[in-house]
Amino acid sequence: MNQIFLTPSQAKRGTLSGMKELRIRRWLGGIFVAAALVAGAQGQGTGTTTSGPSLSTPLYSGASSSIMLSPQSPYSGSVPQGKATADVLPVSFKDAIDRGLRNNLGVLLQSDNEISARGQRWKELSELLPNVTTSTTQSAEQIDLAELGLRFNFPGVPRVVGPIGVFQTGVYLQQTVLSLNSINKVRSASAQQRAARFSYQDARDVVVLATGNAYLETIADAAGVDTATAQVATAQRLFDKTDDQRKAGISPAIDALRAKVELQTRQQQLIAAKNDLAKQKLVLARIIGLPPGQLFELTDKAPYAPLTAMSVDEALKRAYTSRADYLAAEQQVLAAEFTKKSAAAEYYPTIDLAGDYGDAGVNVGNSHGVFQVGATLNIPIFQGGKVHGDVLQADATLKQSRQQLDSLRAQIDSDVRTAMLDLQSAAEQVEVARSSIDLANQTLEQAQDRFNAGVTDNLEVVQAQESVATANANYISSLYAHNLAKVSLARAMGFAEEGVKLYLESNDLSK
């Protein structure tokens, strides 16, 4: 028995009930993916003091039946590698993930942010490390004594002295011996660097989720083309049969008109399905960085396999210890704590050491060793309220970081529970949709038999065809939702990059 498939985007143009159901399913899927990606991107940008592009732009816009990447999101773009070829490039699920991790703009920008954070740490560390310079000068000067205030005329003493040669060379050292302000700045910058490293890993997880969703949706749209093609073929056979009966005087003209309308409706759906597939492939190509104009085909399908998932408590425990955005937020709190200590340390004294050693004289051949060394104790007395203002700002930043961490912890709980609910619901819907397909196909066969036997007109056949289309569309929708829920659960638990590949191999996320 041939199974006819239709994607949710094509089913919306079918019966009203199927359209509403599919719209709700894709709408809910879009909300979850958008929330997961936006939460990840905002976690990367939270409290970051390093320079570089912000990744907190919303990744998905709108809550529609079709999940669309926002053009403003860096995760919707990539840096294409290579040049397009005439050959059709086979792209597997794993290959798409690997390409996205290499070429996606979001992960590349976050990698640059990590380098920027590393540079900021070195800048802060330089305040505690010795600053050593060397210089050599040779000059000649002539001095007017009157310019110096010696306006008296003494016998035998010239009014102008010189030219006098001056030579000096030496090594100069400056060293901060004690500065709690600088020490805590270094500690804060180190925490920021670790946060940037975790944010980079979180960006990779976001890319996996975005790529996985785009790949799965492309599979659904490809199945939609097959569905629409099969529906056109079925409608064509019905029209041919009805038209032959009309010509033979067996069926009325209205039956032929009804069959013709059904055929043209299915043809319109096929045109729309092909267009949707072509556009979705462009979206996928942009995310993973394929060369512009490169033809490719998907080599993996989306089979259904029940997922062996862990309990909610175990999943939450793993998420709190594994999610890179949560670990980054913890480092942001630590950085804010050190920043506050650094601001308070502006009240404390500092000790600096400076010295130099070298040669000085009238020229290189007539010079002698000279040196100078000294220590400076700086004690702040009153700085016009600057330190108080710095402490207030640092304290406010610390409170914000802690609040954002608490909010993210609650969001992780929601993400994990939502993903598990979606996974369970989608699995149940897949089973129901399978049964609906069998029943709809049986109904279509019986309607065709009744029509061929002349018991009824072709209205029953047309209605049965719509039921088959809706049933297969529901199956595709639930299958897409189930596989997306797997990817979303891996993301919610904090190991999307490893978890997606794992579920593809074993359908077990509990390992």
Residue spans for each PLM region:
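Acidic, low-complexity, intrinsically disordered peripheral segments
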Residues: 2-8, 12-13, 18-33, 42-63, ...
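Periplasmic alpha-helical coiled-coil/stalk elements that build and connect Gram-negative outer-membrane
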Residues: 20-21, 204-318, 422, 426, ...
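Bacterial Sec-pathway N-terminal export signals of envelope proteins
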Residues: 45-137, 143, 292, 299-333, ...
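Small/polar-residue-enriched beta-strand and adjacent coil segments characteristic
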Residues: 92, 131-203, 311-314, 318, ...
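Amphipathic alpha-helical coiled-coil segments
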Residues: 109-124, 203, 207-228, 237, ...
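Long amphipathic alpha-helical coiled-coil segments
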Residues: 283-291, 404, 488-499
